[in-house]
Amino acid sequence: MKRTYQPSNVSRKRTHGFLVRMSTKNGRLVIKRRRAKGRKNLAVSIASK
């Protein structure tokens, strides 16, 4: 049986990325909560050159 987590940077960004979060009201609430908590990473971001 295949494992459930098959990592892919593309699908990760498309589902949990910053722009996706900002596109809905609830997503903005997520970012707001994480800012208030003092998270270093507000949303998933893939390091690129």
From Swiss-Prot:
One of its GO terms (cellular component) is ribonucleoprotein complex. Gene3D superfamilies: 1.10.287.3980. Signal peptide: none annotated. The keyword Ribosomal protein applies. It comes from the Bacteria. InterPro entries: Ribosomal_bL34, Ribosomal_bL34_CS. Pfam families: Ribosomal_L34. One of its GO terms (biological process) is translation. One of its GO terms (molecular function) is structural constituent of ribosome. Keywords: Ribonucleoprotein, Ribosomal protein. HAMAP family: Ribosomal_bL34 (MF_00391). Belongs to the bacterial ribosomal protein bL34 family. PANTHER family: LARGE RIBOSOMAL SUBUNIT PROTEIN BL34M, MITOCHONDRIAL RIBOSOMAL PROTEIN 34 FAMILY MEMBER. This is Large ribosomal subunit protein bL34. The gene is rpmH.
